[in-house]
C-alpha cells in the first residue's frame, strides 16, 4: 500500500501540498525514503503549464500525474438527470442517479487506483473526483 496521494485543482492546492510534504519530511525518520507521496494535477480547473516537470525536478514526490477530469457536459447521457421533474422526490431520485452515473463515467479517466493509498487528500470534492470517491466508498481527507 502506498502512503499518500494529493489531488490538486489549483496552484494554491499545490502550494499547501508542498508545505504538508516538507513538514512531513522534516519530522520523518531520516532512514525512511523521502518522496513517498503522489501528486495529481487535475486539468479540469486549471492549466498547470509545465508545473508537472517542475515538481518532478524537486524529487519531493514519488510520482506526479496529470488527471484529465471530465466536466458533466462531456457526458451527454447525464443531461436527462438534470431536468426538473416537477416534484421534490423526482428531483431527488434524479440527483442520486446523476451522482452514481457520473462516478461510473468518470472512472476510466482516474489515473491511479485510489484504493492503494493509505491517505487521500482532495481539496475540492465537489468536482467529479468527489463523486467518484463517494460513490465508490473510498475514504479521503
Question: Can you name each region flagged by the protein language model?
Answer:
Residues 5-141:
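Active-site and donor-binding regions of nucleotide-sugar-utilizing enzymes
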